Every structure is written in C-alpha cells, then in structure tokens.
C-alpha cells in the first residue's frame, strides 16, 4: 500500500495544486493581456500571472481575490480565470438579475420584465446620431438644457409656454391685439 501511495502522491499533489485561490496584490495593465501579482498559499507569491477576461468586457480590478489554474498542472504557469472583490459586490439582486458595476457604486442593473436601471452621477453619450424610439419618455429634472435648436414635430400639450420669462398663455401684445385665443 505504501508503494502505491508513493506512486500516486505526486499525482495527488498536482491535482490539489491545479486550481487555487489567491489574493491579488498588484495589477499590471500595460501588456496585451493583463498581468497580476498574486499571493497564494502561505507565503507563495506568483508574478506575471495572465488574467483572462470575457470577450467584449474588460476591467482593471483593485486588490481582491482570484481563482487561478495551473496550466498543464505546472505551478510555474498560472492563469487567473476569475478576479472578484466581495467588499464592493452589489447585494440585493434577485435570481436572474445581472449587474455591471464600479467599485464607487455606479451600476447598470438588468432586472426582470425587460427593465434596465442605470445609477450614476453623470451619464455621457458620445455619438454622431442618437435615435430613441419609445412609447413614452419622461424627463424629471428641475432644469433641462438644450444647446442646439429644438424641432417639435408633434403638438405640444403644455398648458403654457414661456420665452424669456414671458408667458405665451397670458401675454398681451403691445399692439392691443389681445391675449391669445384658446
């Protein structure tokens, strides 16, 4: 039995070291693929660990935790497949929700019934043309500013329009034409 244990001991050790937890110490985003410095078991430090990310999404994490895989079972060839920081992870989501978030708290949350909720201090869109198609749009803001011309193609249903502080509803022309007729 000891002979068998001696034979399988290296295999067992290799399997145990195949997937590991780690703590992210340093992130280097200067390479084609992001590299990490990780602290693994006890005092083991791994430098230049490649971090793989999902196509179309990229992030630069702060210190956090990682799951690393030893490629080919070699501890000298580690790759990080997941990096996370549970201290800033959004909480309170329900099954099926998905969220893209920043450590400062702003986020885009996709929820049930086709709802997307964007929470942030400032939202900037940079595009040549913006087309918006909706059944209804509501702007709830104490101040709205348009820097260019505004063309209204439909009928304005506002009860009054003001220009330069003058009411269109109650305005009386100097030529004594009278107030606008409703």
From Swiss-Prot:
Disordered as annotated region, ranges: 159-182
Signal sequence region: none
UniProt feature, compositional bias: Basic and acidic residues: 169-182
Top-rank lineage group of the source organism: Bacteria
Record-linked Pfam families: Phage_Mu_Gp45 (PF06890)
InterPro entries found in the cross-reference section: GpV/Gp45, Phage_Mu_Gp45, Phage_Mu_Gp45_N
Family affiliation: To phage Mu protein gp45.
Name this protein carries in UniProt: Mu-like prophage FluMu protein gp45
UniProt organism field: Haemophilus influenzae (strain ATCC 51907 / DSM 11121 / KW20 / Rd)
